[in-house]
Curated annotation (Swiss-Prot):
Disulfide bonds: none annotated. Belongs to the type-II 3-dehydroquinase family. Homododecamer. Substrate binds at N75, H81, D88, L102, S103, R112. It comes from Shewanella halifaxensis (strain HAW-EB4). The keyword Manganese does not apply. PROSITE patterns: DEHYDROQUINASE_II. The active site is at Y26 (proton acceptor), H101 (proton donor). This is 3-dehydroquinate dehydratase. The lineage of its organism: Bacteria, Pseudomonadati, Pseudomonadota, Gammaproteobacteria, Alteromonadales. It is an enzyme of class 4 (lyase).
Amino acid sequence: MSSQPKILLVNGPNLNLLGRREPGHYGHHTLEQIVDDLKQSATQAGIQLDHIQSNAEHLLIEAIHNSDADMVIINPAAFTHTSVALRDALLGVAIPFIEVHLSNVHSREPFRHHSYFSDKAIGVICGLGAQGYQFALQAAIARIHAAEKQG
């Protein structure tokens, strides 16, 4: 583990449009608001939170490859249903991860029901809007603190 525990937050394509893109599915919070709230919560817990959002798959993969995080929180967005490469990046670095989705992907179009990540994630949170990120952060912090006590 790094000297200060670290979480990498990864947000996939189109999440830069949060707050104005289909608010019925994704809510009214902007990505900036979500990330700012998460950083504040992480700092209070003594955790460094690094963030990347990109519409480019290769940039997300490189961020994962280059990370020394203890945990990853990922909203792969549309890559959820298509990206073996992003899945392989997470498996390749062997950093535990939590998958998050703002909307309930299981109540939407059938193509959104399959995830290339869920079977490898330590947990999946979907349908709870921006609050789902906070739940994922709290779970990640708890796992990091438990690992610190053990080792």
